Amino acid sequence: MAYLGLLSLVALQSLVTGAAFPDETIAEWSVNVYNHLRATGEDENILFSPLSIALAMGVMELGAQGSTLKEIRHSMGYESLKSGEEFSFLRDFSSMVSAEEGQYVMKIANSLFVQNGFHINEEFLQMMKMYFNAEVNHVDFSENVAVANYINKWVENYTNSLLKDLVSPGDFDAVTHLALINAVYFKGNWKSQFRPENTRTFSFTKDDESEVQIPMMYQQGEFYYGEFSDGSNEAGGIYQVLEIPYEGDEISMMLVLSRQEVPLATLEPLLKPQLIEEWANSVKKQKVEVYLPRFTVEQEIDLKDILKALGVTEIFIKDANLTAMSDKKELFLSKAVHKSFIEVNEEGSEAAVASGMIAISRMAVLFPQVIVDHPFLFLIKNRKTGTILFMGRVMHPETMNTSGHDFEEL
């Protein structure tokens, strides 16, 4: 079973008192964010939700006008759409992927925390409700300890205590007037489970050639699989792509793995929306031996740095035009935090065909082996639309098992 969760914090400050969403748009945004994160953290794990960021930016876009609005639309890749058309797409897509029963659970929630007595335009509130089903809560940000506790409690209640301490009292002060919280989490059972009795300790080789011992899951079954060339014409120039579906076949995890002797950093520059689409269209269902680490990761990302790097700058300065949100002048974005987690383990709702542990061997076999014992890239995506829900990479799996979450309570 895999669990993913995400929260984005957007706090705003005033100086006066102190169908289906186009998948190529989300894919382009996903790749841009990923490239920024890998450039700023060369040897770090990465995890984020392009969908959650798009929803948070959608709320900000609703409140923007003039050059601030134009800047957001350009950065998000919405210029080819009619003005405001993206809001309907975001609403329809979030409604489509949200599910609380059946084969998987995915929830998306938005809440706007507003300073007591602070005026927010009624039309903006109505549009927030219509497009993002957002709720509004009034608080006193000068009571920063109480506000932090209140928001964290809201987060915990929404995620069944999976995510805690998203914000701290230091995130708020007397001049903070608005905080936007966007929460997304996903829980899915593998269509074909990894049997726990087949999990064994195994070596994971990092890009610096050091090794760590990790729990390695195993199963043999039919999955979507393909081999692709990185264009180098070298012996290690072929890399593997494996797609593992969750129950119901609507959502899947796509794993991208270079040959063991080839660092992931060699493969990452190739990453483009068109290549992701090629992977999805080219993998074929066949019998595969899969060795996949059991891992958990929780990561907090400063969205402010990312958004600035991708061209969104005006919302962070006093000249920001957020007059569609409020008539109050000099309102700007002061803090944006993106927090996410993922757990991947053996659980699923169907029994696996494989029986007993098979020793790992790199000798010739009758069907492909995918041995994920070195750094890899992964995507969680909607198989119908191709839209990327979560994206990341695993460089250090040993750091991914210390989050302390009790995922069984979800």
Swiss-Prot record:
Pfam families: Serpin. GO terms for cellular component: cytoplasmic vesicle lumen; extracellular space; neuronal cell body; perikaryon; secretory granule lumen. Detected in adult pituitary and adrenal gland. The modification Phosphoserine is found at residue 83. SMART domains: SERPIN. Residues 1-16 form the signal peptide. Glycans are attached at residues 157, 321, 401, 403. One of its GO terms (molecular function) is serine-type endopeptidase inhibitor activity. GO terms for biological process: positive regulation of neuron projection development. It is found in: Secreted; Cytoplasmic vesicle, Secretory vesicle lumen; Perikaryon. Its main location: secreted. The record marks 362-363 as: Reactive bond. InterPro entries: Serpin_CS, Serpin_dom, Serpin_fam, Serpin_sf, Serpin_sf_1, Serpin_sf_2. Keywords: Cytoplasmic vesicle, Glycoprotein, Phosphoprotein, Protease inhibitor, Proteoglycan, Secreted, Serine protease inhibitor, Signal. Serine protease inhibitor that inhibits plasminogen activators and plasmin but not thrombin. May be involved in the formation or reorganization of synaptic connections as well as for synaptic plasticity in the adult nervous system. May protect neurons from cell damage by tissue-type plasminogen activator. Belongs to the serpin family. This is Neuroserpin. The lineage of its organism: Eukaryota, Metazoa, Chordata, Craniata, Vertebrata.
